Swiss-Prot record:
Known catalytic reactions: 4-CDP-2-C-methyl-D-erythritol + ATP = 4-CDP-2-C-methyl-D-erythritol 2-phosphate + ADP + H(+)
Family named by the database record: Belongs to the GHMP kinase family. IspE subfamily.
Binding site for ATP: P94, V95, A96, A97, G98, L99, G100, G101, G102, S103, S104
Species the sequence originates in: Latilactobacillus sakei subsp. sakei (strain 23K) (Lactobacillus sakei subsp. sakei)
Gene name of the record: ispE
EC id: 2.7.1.148
InterPro entries: GHMP_kinase_C_dom (IPR013750), GHMP_kinase_C_sf (IPR036554), GHMP_kinase_N_dom (IPR006204), IspE (IPR004424), Ribosomal_Su5_D2-typ_SF (IPR020568), Ribsml_uS5_D2-typ_fold_subgr (IPR014721)
Active site, UniProt feature: K10, D136
Keywords per UniProt: ATP-binding, Isoprene biosynthesis, Kinase, Nucleotide-binding, Transferase
Domain of life where this protein originates: Bacteria
Record's protein name: 4-diphosphocytidyl-2-C-methyl-D-erythritol kinase
Pathway assignment: Isoprenoid biosynthesis; isopentenyl diphosphate biosynthesis via DXP pathway; isopentenyl diphosphate from 1-deoxy-D-xylulose 5-phosphate: step 3/6
Disulfide bonds: none
NCBIfam families according to UniProt: ispE (TIGR00154)
Enzyme class of the recorded protein, top EC level: transferase
Length: 285
């Protein structure tokens, strides 16, 4: 048996850290959406008990370091599955970009094997299992616009966003998320997103109100280490984006436009600064 699961990239429309738990984990409040830039994960069952991962990018790990591999092994051991699977990942999402590519691949494996192994798990149950793999996996199980709270495990779907385009730009730097989070002090945050206003903008389908309320509290930390990220955000707004922001811990940034023609011009302009530039839209449910 075989199936193909789409694994969309995620974008942080807002990212706020409310406080740090005694175990070192943060209490998050984020609004996330998925975009029409995606990996494709083909899963084929096999009689042997092995989990095999193959990727279209030769430099990616295909062993237990790969989150998709971890997802398959986790389900297999938890439910005492005797068979194995071949997982082939066609990569399109930039790697180490703050777009949740690895987490989305893992979530796709959870969804796919839930069907192929006839486990009958709900999205909420898959999300709970996924939290032990990576904090972005619970959201990626749903892959729709949502308010994400707790340690990343509490997902509240919000419905579709108002219509707009995004120009997504990934600079040629790699950011270590643990290093960024290690430098995060919740008591020193000054520029937080206006989450209630952002939620209202989504509910009212008001893109202008929505973008005015967006922010990412990790931006100053990442900018300090990688000033080219701030430069790219300045370029996005200079070329006409209504809002420019970093996704996750970076390094990827994105600009929002309500008009396709303007977004296309920004895309063309930014392509002169970076090799990895994408013109995308948020997914509709």
């Amino acid at each position: 048996m075989q199936l193909i699961e789409k694994a969309p990239a995620k974008i942080n429309l807002s990212l706020d850290a409310l406080y740090q738990h005694t175990d070192g984990e943060f209490e998050w409040q984020m609004i996330m959406t998925s975009i029409d830039l995606a990996d494709y994960v083909q899963i084929t069952l096999q009689d042997s008990p092995q989990i095999e991962v193959r990727t279209s990018k030769g430099y990616l790990p295909e062993d237990k370091r790969n989150l998709a591999y971890q997802a398959a092994q986790l389900l297999r051991h938890r439910f005492d599955i005797k068979t194995g699977a071949i997982i082939e990942i066609d990569k399109h999402i930039p790697v180490a970009a703050g777009l949740g590519g690895g987490s989305s691949d893992a979530a796709a494996v959870l969804r796919g094997l839930n069907q192929l192994w006839h486990l009958g798990l709900t999205e909420a149950e898959l999300a709970h299992i996924g939290l032990s793999i990576d904090s972005d996996v619970p959201y990626c199980v749903y892959s729709e616009t949502a308010l994400v709270t707790g340690k990343g495990d509490q997902i509240q779907p919000l419905g579709d966003l108002p219509n707009f385009w995004m120009v997504v730009v990934k600079p040629e730097v790699s950011v270590s998320t643990p290093r960024i989070l290690h430098a995060l002090n919740c008591d020193q945050i000054t520029d937080r997103p206006q989450t209630d206003r952002l939620l209202a903008g989504i509910q009212q389908q008001d893109a202008q109100q929505m973008t005015a309320a967006m922010a990412n509290v990790l931006t100053p930390i990442t900018n300090q280490r990688y000033p080219q990220i701030d430069y790219l955000m300045q370029r996005l707004t200079a070329f006409g984006a209504e809002k420019a922001q970093m996704s996750g811990s970076g390094p990827t940034v994105f600009g929002i436009c309500r008009q396709y023609s303007r977004a296309q011009r920004i895309y063309n302009s930014m392509s002169g600064f970076c090799r990895e530039v994408y013109l995308v839209q948020p997914l509709k449910k």
